[in-house]
Amino acid sequence: MTEKPVALIVLAAGQGSRMQSDLPKVLHRLGGVPLVGHALSTGRTLEPEAVVVVAGHGAEAVAKAVAKLNPEAKIALQEQQLGTGHAVSQALPQLEGFEGRVIVLYGDTPFIGQETLASLAAHPADVVVLGFEASDPGRYGRLVTGPEGLERIVEYKDADEATRAIRLVNSGVLAADAALLREFLPMIGNRNAAGEYYLTDIPELARAAGHRVEVVTCDEAETLGINTRAELAAAEAAFQVRARARALEDGVTMTDPATVWFALDTCIGRDAVIGQNVVFGPGVTVESGAEILPFCHLEGCHVSAGATVGPFARLRPGAELGGDVHVGNFVEIKNSVLDEGAKVGHLTYLGDAHVGEATNIGAGTVTCNYDGVSKHRTEIGAHAFIGSDTMLVAPVRVGARAMTGSGSVITEDVPDDALALGRAKQVVKPGLATRLMQALRQKKGN
């Protein structure tokens, strides 16, 4: 926590025309979540008193996504995109009564780090601009500093040669006291080529009024913004490199790190082992000592210590694997809990199910959980044995230590310790196969 209370404003109103997409730019996915989710996730580390997301293009879709990412975040609507200063002014009414530090972030700039945000929040200056030393300053606005801090921000088109030689440039991210923003935002003009109101005018206005204005710097990589599909692909590659490095540093073994793909919130314990070509979607936790074998896809699931998954397995949202559970190849599990020591070896679908401790699920077992309208649950007790190719037609319960015969279709509850058979009686016709084949060949010959 910082000494001053903190509020976040995340600007997410732009259309992103260079993305060539009907989807709002901030909803394109990076690390398995919408771009705007990265700013919200990092900002959460400051424990902000309020979060406001400014939406414009595709506002309804943005609001829906934000509600899932941070249910406490508020939405401010910027109906006309008239610049960053105008966007922040639309958010301020949502911060009525807030007195503290406001940090303005961008929904399309996903890599601003926790330490950088903490520096912006804790800095004693009245206004703090986030800058970076650019390898190629290009057309960035230059930050002109002096003994008393930031003197001015000079846009490239307005800069002389000496100013253009400055490599310290503006990221666009800004932190300022809420009272100062309320005072100076109405003073911003739009006398520029675009006719827009720019947040970058705030430092100059504040300095002219005697306020302290400073610069905090970060690594250039943190400021990577995304405006095109190519930049999105580059950002995904950069995100994965960082995520893999972090996992290795945390004690995770990966047999081929370059083939493992992480989501923003992937959490893997030390001494877990991850095989090649594993994909983690959002919402996955893997405890210490678990093993994910090659070619698995996991999303919205929990894998306990000692469990093994794969190869070629899929864990979907709501899958909960207890300790020492084994999930083998070509198994799909959704919204199901497998208690400690349960085994599902191969070729199985478990949906909306609870599998008890040390139960064995035979190959080809399917929980028939959907009747075309509603989902239904399957309950399987501890130490049960489900024979291969069993169809469990939910809602149904198989008791503890019970068994089902291979090929059974189970439509009624099976008591504890019982054996259930639900298949037609086998009939053997001696010699019929030979006679039938002879007749068929004769018919074909005619």
From Swiss-Prot:
Quote one Gene Ontology molecular function term. UDP-N-acetylglucosamine diphosphorylase activity
Binding residues for Mg(2+), per the UniProt record? 108, 227
Documented EC number(s): 2.7.7.23, 2.3.1.157
Q: Where in the cell is it found?
A: Cytoplasm
Q: What class of enzyme is it?
A: transferase
Superkingdom of origin organism: Bacteria
Q: How is the cofactor bound?
A: Binds 1 Mg(2+) ion per subunit.
Residues annotated for acetyl-CoA binding in this entry: 363, 369-370, 388, 406, 423
Query: Where does the record place the catalytic residues?
Result: 346 (proton acceptor)
What Pfam families would the database entry show? NTP_transf_3
Which pathway does this chain act in?
Nucleotide-sugar biosynthesis; UDP-N-acetyl-alpha-D-glucosamine biosynthesis; N-acetyl-alpha-D-glucosamine 1-phosphate from alpha-D-glucosamine 6-phosphate (route II): step 2/2; Nucleotide-sugar biosynthesis; UDP-N-acetyl-alpha-D-glucosamine biosynthesis; UDP-N-acetyl-alpha-D-glucosamine from N-acetyl-alpha-D-glucosamine 1-phosphate: step 1/1; Bacterial outer membrane biogenesis; LPS lipid A biosynthesis
Keywords, A to Z, come to:
Acyltransferase, Cell shape, Cell wall biogenesis/degradation, Cytoplasm, Magnesium, Metal-binding, Multifunctional enzyme, Nucleotidyltransferase, Peptidoglycan synthesis, Repeat, Transferase
Q: Region annotation Linker: residue ranges?
A: 230-250
For whether the record's keyword set contains Nucleotidyltransferase, the answer is yes
Q: Which processes are annotated in GO (biological process)? A: cell morphogenesis; cell wall organization; lipid A biosynthetic process; peptidoglycan biosynthetic process; regulation of cell shape; UDP-N-acetylglucosamine biosynthetic process
Q: Which InterPro entries match?
A: Bifunctional_GlmU, GlmU-like, GlmU_C_LbH, Hexapep_transf_CS, MobA-like_NTP_Trfase, Nucleotide-diphossugar_trans, Trimer_LpxA-like_sf
On assembly, the entry states: Homotrimer.
Q: What does this protein do?
A: Catalyzes the last two sequential reactions in the de novo biosynthetic pathway for UDP-N-acetylglucosamine (UDP-GlcNAc). The C-terminal domain catalyzes the transfer of acetyl group from acetyl coenzyme A to glucosamine-1-phosphate (GlcN-1-P) to produce N-acetylglucosamine-1-phosphate (GlcNAc-1-P), which is converted into UDP-GlcNAc by the transfer of uridine 5-monophosphate (from uridine 5-triphosphate), a reaction catalyzed by the N-terminal domain.
What family does the Swiss-Prot or TrEMBL record give for this protein?
In the N-terminal section; belongs to the N-acetylglucosamine-1-phosphate uridyltransferase family. In the C-terminal section; belongs to the transferase hexapeptide repeat family.
UniProt-recorded name of the protein? Bifunctional protein GlmU
Q: State the species of origin.
A: Paracoccus denitrificans (strain Pd 1222)
Q: What gene is behind this protein?
A: glmU
